[in-house]
């Protein structure tokens, strides 16, 4: 089931209660859209009472400074921790700095959300849907 959104694809599988998010590009000129996108993801998680998210960050480009990127990702993690989300899986990029930001954000919500990153889509899905 596709959840309507102007800026990104939110594909929800109610059978497994998994929301698939194709992560957007982040450039200085797209920051207002990125803020909107984060709000939309949080709203979808709340509205559909989603328990699992899979984000695909492999193709997204980030040109904002890492400090700004970290602030955004930390904000997302902290907002997700206020929902009933249980598991968050991420498909890895090849950017070590971005992966470090993701790991740091995950550390902010330890105990609230279980986080894992993967290189393989099938492994990520299997991890999300296991009990």
Say what each PLM segment does.
Residues 2-131:
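Amphipathic, Lys/Arg-enriched alpha-helical "gate/interface" segment within cytosolic domains
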